[in-house]
Structure formats: structure tokens, C-alpha cells
Regions:
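N-terminal secretory signal peptides that target proteins for export/translocation
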Residues: 1-7
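Bacterial N-terminal signal peptides
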Residues: 10-23
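An extracytoplasmic/periplasmic, membrane-proximal ligand-sensing/linker region
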Residues: 32-39, 43-54, 225-289
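Short loop->beta-strand "edge-of-pocket" segments that line small-molecule binding or catalytic clefts
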Residues: 33-43, 132-149
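Hydrophobic/proline-rich hinge and linker segments of small-molecule sensing/allosteric domains
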Residues: 107-130, 218-222
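Pocket-lining segment of extracytoplasmic ligand-binding domains
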Residues: 126, 137-236
Length: 289
């Protein structure tokens, strides 16, 4: 056929090239997925970013899957992004109520930090020495979404019929600052953040009440938005970070930045580790569910 129609083969190749060109162009233009990661604002926005940015940069490089930090001005703002399904990965304990369970989030890890306890505390030199003295007082909290820092201590106050006014600072450091500026008479928080602030800022607290133990916040992914292969890659990077000398160095520096007492790293976890959170909602006051 080529002998009878010189140049026919070249014509076919040219037509094939033209036909395939758009597909090849689209393939080369295709960008890898970028997943948004939203950790609860445990500190002010700058310190939260200082802690997490080096960690997620490492995880992105190690996994080959791009993560991007997405945090709001307050912890409530950040959780609003999550509830609006604007993110794919979180570090949170705000998603264990029955309504939020239905959103399709799944636990894959947590920090190896000691168990957290909710606490109600006053400044070390405060004249207040018992929780009953908080009746009619103002108590600072990070925000209404904070499970250990707000829902647990406020539920305890309600159970004791101690009528106090909640003042939301937007993040835990702001609530602590209000306490030591005399704008509130007590704070609700978790034990890790009280200990960390005490070390970092050289401040003394007097703890009036402590709850039972709860696991630290959970690393979670959206089962509706992230394919299994990307979950496995990101999970492996988080959970193996402390075994890599460079990863361990990043974790050490990040822990120092926020006043953590130890080099907290990430370990495997599952939804069953957070059963105590779900139990709370079975009997919690309606205003705290």
C-alpha cells in the first residue's frame, strides 16, 4: 500500500499525532492532588503554624502526596472548615458526636503524648481555692468546639450547679492571657496545654478540678475524599517520622516551639481508642452536644 500511495504512512502518523496531542497535553498538565490539613488551634494561629508547617512539609516530601495547612483564626473557625468539607485531613477531637460521626472521618493515628485530662484552674496566686467559689465568675475557654478544654469542664460545672459565664478567647493561649491579665477568674483547658504554658511562659496555676483520662487529639482522614493509596502514604510518613533522623529533629524543634515537655511523635490509633469521647455524648447536656 505504501508503494502505491507514497507518503500515506507519514500522513497516518501525522493524523495520529494530532489526535493524541490533546490527551498527552492534558496528561502532562494534570497536577497531583493537594490535600488540606486542618489541626485544631491548640495555640494562637502563629504558634500553631510554627508547630505544624515543618511537620506537614516533611510528610509531603516523604509521602509524595502534597499536604497544605488550612487553619482559621480560632479553633471554631478551623472546625467550620472541616464541617464544610473543605479539608481532607485533620488533627482534632471535635468529630466524635453522633452527628459528626456520620460525616465519614476515620482515625489513623495520634500523638504519643500522655493521656489528656480536662482541668479547671486559676492563677497560682488567686484567692479562689475551690470550684464552688467559681459561682457567678467568668471562666476563660479556647472556644465552644474544644472538647477537653470546654465541653468536659463546663459539663462538670453544670452537674455541680455552678453557674459561671463562659468567655471564649479563640484559642487556649488567649484564654490563659485573659486569666493572668485578670479579665477572667479561671480557665478550662487540658492538662497538656496547662503544663506547656506553665513551662513556656513561667506561669503558675492552681488546678481546682481534673477529669478522667482521654487520648490526645486524633489524626483523621475523610473516607469520602481520599483514596486508600494516598491514605497509606501519608499515614506511613506521619507514623514513621520519629524513626528518621531528620524527621525526629523536626519533631524535637516543633515540640520546643510550643512548650511540649517531650518530643511528641505520632503512633497508630483507631476509632476504638476514642470510645470515651463518644460515651460523653450519650449523657452530655443538650447545649454541649
Amino acid at each position: 500500500m505504501n508503494d502505491r500511495y507514497p507518503g500515506f504512512g507519514k500522513l497516518v502518523l501525522a493524523l495520529l499525532s494530532l489526535a493524541l496531542a490533546p490527551a498527552l497535553t492534558h496528561a502532562s498538565d494534570a497536577k497531583p492532588a493537594v490535600y488540606r490539613f486542618s489541626p485544631v488551634n491548640q495555640w494562637d494561629i502563629n504558634r500553631t503554624a510554627t508547630y505544624w508547617n515543618p511537620i506537614i512539609q516533611y510528610v509531603s516530601e516523604k509521602s509524595g502526596v502534597q499536604l497544605q495547612l488550612k487553619i482559621g483564626r480560632t479553633s471554631a473557625d478551623t472546625t467550620a472548615y472541616v464541617l464544610a468539607q473543605e479539608v481532607e485531613f485533620v488533627f482534632s477531637n471535635h468529630l466524635f458526636s453522633p452527628e459528626r460521626d456520620a460525616l465519614g472521618w476515620k482515625v489513623f493515628g495520634r500523638r504519643n503524648a500522655p493521656p489528656l485530662r480536662a482541668q479547671i484552674a486559676v492563677a497560682g496566686d488567686s484567692p479562689i481555692t475551690s470550684i464552688e467559689q467559681l459561682k457567678g465568675q467568668q471562666i476563660g475557654f479556647a472556644g465552644p468546639e474544644a472538647f477537653i478544654g470546654y465541653k468536659l469542664p463546663y459539663a462538670h460545672l453544670l452537674s455541680r450547679k455552678i453557674d459561671a459565664t463562659a468567655v471564649f478567647g479563640g484559642n487556649q493561649n488567649a484564654a490563659f492571657a485573659q486569666l493572668f491579665a485578670g479579665k477572667v477568674q479561671a480557665v478550662g483547658s487540658n492538662s497538656m496545654l496547662i503544663d506547656g504554658y506553665s513551662v513556656k511562659e513561667n506561669k503558675k496555676f492552681r488546678v481546682l478540678w481534673t477529669s478522667e483520662e482521654y487520648h490526645d487529639l486524633a489524626l483523621m482522614y475523610s473516607t469520602k475524599k481520599v483514596p486508600e493509596k494516598d491514605v497509606k502514604a501519608i499515614s506511613a510518613a506521619f507514623l514513621g517520622m520519629h524513626l528518621d533522623p531528620r524527621g525526629a529533629q523536626i519533631l524535637h524543634a516543633a515540640s520546643n516551639e510550643v512548650g511540649l515537655k517531650q518530643d511528641a511523635y505520632f503512633i497508630p490509633a483507631s476509632d476504638s481508642d476514642y470510645a470515651s469521647y463518644r460515651r460523653f455524648y450519650q449523657s452530655a447536656p443538650a447545649s454541649l452536644r
